[in-house]
């Protein structure tokens, strides 16, 4: 099993990525959330020149953020700096689009986007639609080797629902899933494996990535300690961010625990007060997956963190991740919270025992 990190992209994310490489992590994924974080391709370029072996990927790229030919060029340019170390995770856009008041990209549009990007990277001549015009495009001078089209760039789709899983299976990409617990994530992997069977593929060939958000607790440390709240709290309240917008947007499909419903009701009251009223998303996604906002602090309880994140002692987390590995996940990715970069050492120490 590959052990990797995911970072909330900063222009200097290369520093934590370099440290992760030194500690034995094999991949680093970078957020593509333009209203909250730095550009992933800028950060990945810096990481490419400061590291030697760690694999670098978009985690995950959102199609509407760039034209498909631009994305193909960005990936190939990075591939020149770090040959064979570049990966493309892609999704329909949760945070990146919600932060601008938009819903997810349509799956058919994402499939077309992937077709164009992959075709260009294979040096094919591609039919491409833009602004109602159909054009034939290709890279014009790959022989000059300004970019690297020789080394393959693997693709992964972040998929929570059945249609997204079916698309990943049809295209034969890797699959990225957000982990809350081993039991829940193993069940989702089984659904994904069945999608591969239905697509005529061998489930054993599926490369499944489990992305986990949480905190490695010291023995006796409570789930709502200041450190645990800072590291795991943003991942827990993210579920409330998603569900609070359920009337306007399709949700990720996470279920809020029935016995914790009073916490969500309290959050909905907070959400109702956000201004401007026509753009509540400007508040609800502020600091999203990076920090707790002051009004969220009382809601990030020990039980919420315990139930909605991958938080626990070393022994507990080792058992959870072994269960993911034994079920067929090929990679576990730990979210390194912005401003808490020492998490990379804490997760490395815990993962060393697996």
Protein language model regions, located:
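Active-site mouth loops of central-metabolism enzymes
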Residues: 1-11, 61-69, 149-160, 214-217, ...
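N-terminal beta1-alpha1-beta2 module of alpha/beta enzyme domains
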Residues: 1-58, 153
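Hydrophobic faces of well-ordered beta-strands that scaffold small-molecule active sites
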Residues: 1-7, 28-30, 55-59, 86-90, ...
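Acidic (Asp/Glu)-rich catalytic clusters
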Residues: 18-22, 44-55, 75-86, 169-170, ...
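Conserved, mostly hydrophobic/aromatic
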Residues: 24, 47, 78, 117, ...
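Glycine-rich, proline-tolerant flexible connector loops at the mouths of alpha/beta enzymes
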Residues: 27-50, 62, 94, 179-180, ...
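Alpha-helix-loop-beta-strand connector modules within alpha/beta enzyme cores
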Residues: 41-58, 113-116, 120, 348-354
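An alpha-helical appendage that flanks or caps ligand/catalytic pockets
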Residues: 103, 107-144, 190-323
């Amino acid at each position: 099993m590959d052990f990797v990190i995911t970072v909330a992209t900063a222009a200097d994310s290369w520093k934590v990525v370099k440290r992760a490489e030194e500690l034995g992590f094999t991949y680093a994924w970078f957020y593509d959330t333009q209203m909250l974080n730095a550009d992933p391709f800028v950060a990945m370029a810096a990481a490419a020149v400061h590291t030697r072996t760690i694999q670098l990927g978009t985690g995950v790229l959102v199609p509407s953020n760039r034209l498909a030919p631009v994305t193909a060029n960005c990936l190939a340019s990075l591939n020149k700096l770090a040959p064979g170390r570049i990966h493309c995770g892609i999704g329909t856009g949760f945070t990146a689009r919600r932060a601008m008041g938009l819903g997810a990209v349509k799956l058919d549009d994402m499939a077309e986007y992937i077709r164009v990007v992959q075709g260009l990277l294979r040096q094919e001549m591609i039919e491409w639609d833009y602004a109602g015009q159909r054009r034939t495009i290709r890279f014009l001078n790959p022989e000059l080797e300004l970019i690297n089209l020789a080394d393959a760039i693997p693709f992964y789709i972040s998929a929570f629902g059945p249609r997204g899983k079916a698309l990943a299976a049809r295209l034969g990409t890797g699959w990225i899933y957000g982990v809350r617990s081993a039991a829940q994530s193993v069940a989702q992997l089984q659904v994904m494996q069945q999608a591969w069977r239905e697509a005529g593929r061998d489930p054993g060939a599926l490369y499944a990535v489990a992305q986990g958000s949480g905190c490695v607790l010291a023995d006796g440390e409570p789930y709502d300690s200041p450190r645990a709240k800072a590291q795991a709290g943003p991942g827990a309240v993210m579920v409330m961010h998603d569900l609070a917008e359920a009337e306007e947007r399709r949700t990720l499909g996470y279920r809020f625990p029935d016995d914790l419903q009073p916490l969500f009701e309290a959050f909905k009251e907070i959400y109702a007060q956000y201004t401007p009223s026509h753009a509540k998303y400007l508040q609800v996604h502020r600091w999203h997956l990076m920090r707790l906002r002051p009004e969220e602090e009382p809601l990030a309880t020990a039980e919420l963190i315990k139930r909605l994140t991958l938080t626990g002692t070393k022994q507990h987390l080792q058992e959870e991740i072994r269960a993911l590995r034994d079920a067929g996940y090929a990679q576990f990715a730990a979210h390194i919270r912005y401003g808490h970069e020492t998490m990379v050492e804490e997760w490395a120490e815990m993962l060393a025992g697996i």
